[in-house]
Every structure is written in structure tokens, then in C-alpha cells.
Amino acid sequence: MGIRRRARELAMQALFYMDVHHNASPQMLQRFCDNFIPPQKARPFFLKLVNGVLESQPQIDALIERFSKNWRVKRMACVDRNVMRIAVFEMLFCQDIPPKVSINEAIDVGKKFGTEESGAFINGIIDRIRMAIEKGEIQIDRPVETPNNNVE
């Protein structure tokens, strides 16, 4: 498994952990990292994804809701919504990652951790977001570099 795939999987698990506990604090992220130690090489990308998603979550969730049909983010399966949050963050803010790579990775992570339908569900929504980004239909407010929240 590649470094970025491992970072994505751990980021999804960390976001899931914080989502289930309704606590997205730096202390909760630290608790996750204490129990599920990200490999050193995966750590920078892992932190970029987690912190980036948390910082941009209102914007990301609004896009997911806008491009899903009759779904509210909070009603989606926890795995699916956090996988999509990561993919949308990558498409909006990680210019070095082609959108199709973000989508394929999201589908694979969704299939691994979600339900039988997760891959198709995730693909349908984030591919619509990708097309809207490519058409210039989405305004992107790019944040400054995301801090690492002092997680060691």
C-alpha cells in the first residue's frame, strides 16, 4: 500500500473517530494518533488531510449536499461522508493531485471501510463535484497552509 493511500485511510478513520464522538478538537486528534500511530512518512499528508477537512468542513459539506440528490450530509453513512470530505478537500485544495486520482482513491477507501453501495454512492456525488469544478461553477476559497494542530 502506498504512503498516500495509508494517509487517506488513517485520515478517514481519524475523521470518523472525531465525527462519532462529536469532538473535532486537537486533543481528540491527538488521542486518535496515540492509539493509531500514523507511519512517519504518511504523517504529513495525513495531517494535511485531517486539518484541511476540519478547517474547510462547512464549505465541503455544503458542496456534498448540493451535489447529492435528496441527501443531507448528517444522514449519510459516517464512512461515506468522511471519505467524500477527503476527496472534495483534495479536489479543491491539493493541486498536485489529479481529481480522478482523488475520486478513485475515495472509491477504493469507501469500498474497503463502507458498505457494498459505498463506492457507487461516493463516485456519483464527487464526480458531479469534479465536473462542476472543471466547468468553473464552484468558487474556491483556498485556505492558507493548514497547521498541524501540534499533534506529535
Residue ranges: model-predicted function:
Residues 1-152:
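N-terminal interaction/assembly modules
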